Amino acid sequence: MTTASALLDRRVATARGKSVLTRTRKTAPREDVGLRMTKPVAKMKSASASAKNSIALLRRPAPFSSAAAGLNGAANPLPDDVLHAMRQFDDRAVLVTGGSGSFGRRFVETLLQHSRARRIIVFSRDEYKHYELQQHLEPLGTERMRFFIGDVRDGDRLEIATREVDYIVHAAALKQVPAAEYNPFECMRTNVTGAENVVRAALRNNVNRVIALSTDKAANPINLYGASKLASDKIFIAANNMAGKTDIRFAVVRYGNVVGSRGSVIPFFRKLVDEGADHLPITDERMTRFWITLQQGVNFVITSFTMMRGGEIFVPKIPSMRIVDLAQCFAPDLPLRVVGIRPGEKLHEVMVTEDDSRLTLELADRYVIEPAFAWWQRAPYTASGAKTVPDGFRFASNTNTDWLDGEGLRRLLAEAF
């Protein structure tokens, strides 16, 4: 039977003769993309069936996955450094805002399986999602779990929820770019006022460590969502000055698109194929994005907690991928149709800007953007092997030196499903 790896190899070969999906480290993507815009109707039907078969193959467990062993069937343990970092949560209380969302669910599940946290608190608005998460986690035992219905816009409710809490992961956000453009007040209330409320609650309740999730869209933002997350980042970084001489520390984690998260392109493509679509829509054939899996994102947050000193923005070194390559690997026999960029979208994303470069340190697995605090000292990082990046350095999805090949895409898709 044809394996998923072999299937992708054929897709790569047929997509355009010679594909960028073979490893192209230190090589930017080519721009000469030939899109197949039309096909006979009879062939369309067989293409849709072929695409469904492709997804069935991609759903099979991969030989390698970054996911933790858990309820979703992944068979690989956490990396040693992440398991070691789990010790920081021993006998501690951890609260996750947006805890019933894609990231929150995986983070909570990982803590429940691999940590000795005293209490794990899910804080989110949706009662039904709380119920679903409770049912999902039941096989692991939920004695340590607490479920708070609340909105980050409600500062009083947050203050109650964060009492006797040691760690906060702030994952609650309105993140859909077009929705934010058309609902600006709602976006700002959740993403900016919500950030302020989390900071105030953490300061009042002496929460030890707080990490806020950010996005590549917060660097050089051109849309309201990115601007709101940039404002949120600034609030969390400045909160370290508000903490004064206490031991309360705030930091930010910034990464790109999460494979398989709700509202992302992969579930969208999957839905279209399952419904028998005769083409896949893409916004622009030149578009590139950073990609990270849910579990990789969770692991990155956990290890960032261990090294944070307060005020940093942690950026993982993750690969880029062209949207057209994702579409062709997901459903190789379906034609692609360019539908145009949506309001607020960029062709390429940036996670470290040229202006950030003078404050950026490089470690083996991440970049660390330092705060411009007078009291900040980089010695602990340089002692650990961190190096300064060249002046004018830029970490962008289109100039990245690490590009997903067919095998990498197979792993990501296998984990997503």
Give names to the regions the model predicted.
Residues 93-110:
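N-terminal Rossmann NAD(P)H-binding glycine-rich loop of SDR-like oxidoreductase domains
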Residues 116-129:
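Conserved glycine-rich Rossmann-like NAD(P)H-binding loop of the short-chain dehydrogenase/reductase
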Residues 124, 148-149, 189:
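Conserved residues in the N-terminal Rossmann fold of short-chain dehydrogenase/reductase
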Residues 146-167:
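Conserved Rossmann-fold cofactor-binding substructure of NAD(P)-dependent oxidoreductases
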Residues 167-170, 174-230, 234, 238:
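Conserved Rossmann-fold NAD(P)-dependent oxidoreductase catalytic core, especially the SDR/UDP-sugar
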